[in-house]
Swiss-Prot record:
Keywords: ATP synthesis, Cell inner membrane, Cell membrane, CF(1), Hydrogen ion transport, Ion transport, Membrane, Transport. It is found in: Cell inner membrane. F-type ATPases have 2 components, F(1) - the catalytic core - and F(0) - the membrane proton channel. F(1) has five subunits: alpha(3), beta(3), gamma(1), delta(1), epsilon(1). F(0) has three main subunits: a(1), b(2) and c(10-14). The alpha and beta chains form an alternating ring which encloses part of the gamma chain. F(1) is attached to F(0) by a central stalk formed by the gamma and epsilon chains, while a peripheral stalk is formed by the delta and b chains. This is ATP synthase subunit delta. The gene is atpH. GO terms for cellular component: plasma membrane; proton-transporting ATP synthase complex. Its main location: membrane. F(1)F(0) ATP synthase produces ATP from ADP in the presence of a proton or sodium gradient. F-type ATPases consist of two structural domains, F(1) containing the extramembraneous catalytic core and F(0) containing the membrane proton channel, linked together by a central stalk and a peripheral stalk. During catalysis, ATP synthesis in the catalytic domain of F(1) is coupled via a rotary mechanism of the central stalk subunits to proton translocation. This protein is part of the stalk that links CF(0) to CF(1). It either transmits conformational changes from CF(0) to CF(1) or is implicated in proton conduction. InterPro entries: ATP_synth_OSCP/delta_N_sf (IPR026015), ATPase_OSCP/dsu (IPR000711). GO terms for molecular function: proton-transporting ATP synthase activity, rotational mechanism. It comes from the Bacteria. Belongs to the ATPase delta chain family.
């Protein structure tokens, strides 16, 4: 593959680079050539959701203790149960054979970024203390669209350590309105005052 074919052919908000970026770009270009961008995105979203829900699956992905054979068997069963086949199944197999499964979450994120660029969307990562309701996500999308002038795709994640509030990252900008940050700021201010 020539060097200029490796670079994504769409404009960027986030650089997609490194090992995860190369794998995601290869999958993206293959999916684009086969007209399967949305199908692959759906499969990757399901895998991402499974990773968010299962600490055992995360351990399988991140731990170097598991052999490629163990990862292939276990992940193969997970993919089959989730009804994921085709490009994504082959992609995961390649990632496992190359011992890069630890970077799967980054690869999924990079693919999502590439797809959003192609669609002219921005991606916002939103971390909240509690799961957001659908109405809250839609309200946040509308507010971000108003602020950026572009359609915004929202990736949500729950982190109970925030206590309350949100951390929103769009491009290189981050807004941290979490209760944890406010309490830490108050604690620092109190230490400086004494």
């Amino acid at each position: 593959m020539s060097k200029d074919r490796r670079a994504p052919h769409v404009s960027s908000d986030h650089p997609v680079s490194g090992v995860a970026g190369r794998y995601a770009t290869a999958l993206f270009e293959l999916a684009d050539a086969e007209g399967a961008l949305d199908a692959v995105a759906g499969d990757l979203e399901r895998i991402s959701a499974m990773l968010n829900e299962s600490s055992d699956l995360v351990r399988l992905v991140r731990s170097p203790i598991f052999s490629a054979e163990d990862q292939t068997k276990a992940f193969g069963a997970v993919l089959e149960k989730a009804g994921i086949s085709g490009l994504v199944k082959n992609f995961i197999g390649l990632v496992i054979r190359n011992r890069r499964l630890f970077g799967l979450s980054d690869m999924i994120g990079a693919y999502t970024t590439l797809l959003a660029r192609k669609r002219g969307e921005m991606t916002a990562d939103v971390v909240s203390a509690h799961p957001l309701q659908a109405a809250q996500v839609e309200s946040l999308k509308a507010a971000l669209k108003s602020a950026t002038g572009r359609d915004v795709r929202i990736n949500t994640k729950v982190d109970a350590s925030l206590l309350g509030g949100l951390i929103v990252t769009v491009g290189s900008r981050m807004v941290d309105s979490s209760l944890r940050t406010k309490l830490n700021s108050l604690k620092i201010a109190m230490k400086e005052a004494s």
